[in-house]
Amino acid sequence: MPKVGMQPIRRQQLIEATLQAVDQVGMGDASIALIARLAGVSNGIISHYFQDKNGLIAATMRYLMSVLSENVTARRQALADSSPRAHLQVIIEGNFDASQVNGPAMKTWLAFWATSMHQPSLHRLQRINDHRLYSNLCCEFRRVLPLEDARTAARGLAALIDGLWLRGALSGDAFDTAQAQQIAYEYMDFQLAKQVS
């Protein structure tokens, strides 16, 4: 008989083991057996909680997306300045937070992006993540720019964030998040300078 309250603990344990496995061997070679071994549980536990490896990968991505969302939300709620610039700045910072640019997270995101092109459930998660970033950026730009300009600025900043993140993840060097953020801030300020008085 399972212990009461173990499900959330086991699920998190398996998600963390998945991040570790993808970091060590990549998503393709991150087998159920390896993940279970890293988590210190039997293979059957993964099937019990997630059905299969795809279910576990989807849960791991939902976890990373949740951490990103919670981080950005907390930063926005802590703002003393309610200007669009302040909100855009913390959205940028949240996307380059240590929770998103550590080795296991970066390798899992990269593998997720590649796999999402072939798996509908993961593609859906990718679209949700893309839309969330675009929507948050567009909402803030819309406070000072006409609708079409706000949409264009949001698309550009979202693409820049993703591109800077991708280059940082693939560089093989330590990710210079300060430089990435500065480049994104400069684009943000360029767009905000178009503000209609």
Swiss-Prot record:
Q: Does DNA-binding count among this protein's keywords? A: yes
Regions recorded as binding DNA: 31-50
This protein's pathway reads: Amine and polyamine biosynthesis; betaine biosynthesis via choline pathway [regulation]
**Which Pfam families does this UniProt record tie to the protein?**
TetR_C_6, TetR_N
Q: Does the keyword Cell inner membrane apply?
A: no
GO biological processes: glycine betaine biosynthetic process from choline; negative regulation of DNA-templated transcription
Keywords of this entry: DNA-binding, Repressor, Transcription, Transcription regulation
Q: Which residues form the HTH tetR-type domain?
A: 8-68
What job does this protein perform? Repressor involved in the biosynthesis of the osmoprotectant glycine betaine. It represses transcription of the choline transporter BetT and the genes of BetAB involved in the synthesis of glycine betaine.
Its protein name is HTH-type transcriptional regulator BetI
